[in-house]
Design a protein with these regions (language model features):
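Solvent-exposed alpha-helical segments and adjacent loops
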Residues: 119-296
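Hydrophobic, secondary-structure "cap" segments at the distal end of domains
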Residues: 65-115
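Secretory targeting signatures
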Residues: 1-33, 201
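Eukaryote-biased recognition of intrinsically disordered, low-complexity regulatory segments
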Residues: 33-57, 142-155
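Surface-exposed patches in mature extracellular/periplasmic domains of secreted proteins
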Residues: 54, 74-84, 182-191, 289
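Short, solvent-exposed loop/turn motifs
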Residues: 50, 107-108, 238, 295
Length: 296
């Protein structure tokens, strides 16, 4: 016998579904909403984004340093071009800790007095140690590096995948096509020209390209890399898992400080790659990189 649900329960279910839809889409639409209002966002964080100290909206059309001064107590050096302290957290030469600023995920290649904030920009000031990692870009502010770019310039996006990761690649493609120009190709169809001139999201584990990128992990400032079947961190600890890490493209002829196109690598064991992708697409990134796995 078929039973009808009470009207009240149906209404509650509909409301829950609508709330869920709103939460999924609101973050993706946030860039456009902020841009429409002529606003930008400043985030102040510690230790590669692990602790957020402040997150506030600011006006666009002003320099990064002026925006920072409007929301925090700032001490400067070298003629006002170098930030040495934010809210009483100071540079530490002995411990090799300093403040670095990123725009939509890119480590800026100009001083904070020289970058003029555009509507929709996300500017992050992060205090971290540079002794072991020189990080040229950060993933925590995904997807702004693709949707906003640096200095208001974006590049077409290509999602590239090894056959094992086709489903995850299609999920990313369907997510990103809502806001950027994007194509999807199998790794065997990837050309050098694509790598040099586009943003690339690469999903893989065993291809020569993945191996090549992994071999440069130290140069790229990555905390994790693949070694055979394992993910290895900068301390040599091994995991069975997968990671997502980002870099300014090493295939750009101008180098990894050009602030032009981005390469995002999602790599590792098959059972963990899907989890990493879900973390990205659901905005659950809690540091400059994502790693999911079990320590060995």
């Amino acid at each position: 016998m078929n039973r009808k649900l009470p009207t009240g329960i149906i209404s509650i279910i509909v409301i829950i579904l609508l709330i869920g839809l709103f939460l999924i889409t609101s973050n993706l639409n946030n860039t456009q909403n902020v841009e429409d209002e002529g606003k930008a966002k400043i985030i102040i964080s510690l230790n590669f984004g692990e602790k957020i100290l402040k997150e506030v909206m600011v006006e666009s059309g002003i320099s990064v340093i002026d925006a920072l001064k409007s929301v925090a107590n700032v001490s400067l050096a070298y003629g006002g071009k170098f930030v040495v302290s934010i809210d009483n957290i100071s540079s530490d030469l002995k411990e090799q800790r300093d403040w670095f600023y990123y725009v939509n995920g890119f480590l800026a290649n100009v001083g904070a007095a020289d970058y003029i904030i555009h509507p929709g920009d996300v500017v992050r000031w992060d205090y971290h140690c540079w002794k072991t990692l020189l990080v040229n870009s950060e993933l925590q502010d995904f997807p702004y590096m693709f949707t906003k770019g640096y200095s208001n310039k974006t590049y077409p996006l290509v999602v590239v995948y090894e056959p094992t990761f086709r489903n995850e690649a299609e999920k990313i493609y369907n997510f990103m096509k809502k806001s950027v120009t994007v194509n999807i190709v199998k790794i065997e169809n990837l050309t050098r020209e694509i790598l040099e001139r586009n943003n690339v999201i690469l999903l893989g584990k065993s291809s020569k390209l993945v191996e090549e990128i992994n071999s440069r992990y130290d140069e790229l400032g990555w905390k994790y890399h693949l070694s055979g079947d394992y993910v290895v961190d900068i301390h040599g600890k091994k995991y069975r898992g997968a990671f997502a890490q980002i870099t300014q493209s090493p295939y750009n002829s101008k180098g990894i400080g050009a602030c032009e196109n981005i390469l995002l690598l999602i790599a590792g064991n098959e059972e963990y790659v899907g989890t990493v992708v879900d973390i990205l697409l659901n905005y659950k990134i809690d540091s400059f990189w994502v790693m999911e796995g079990e320590p060995l």
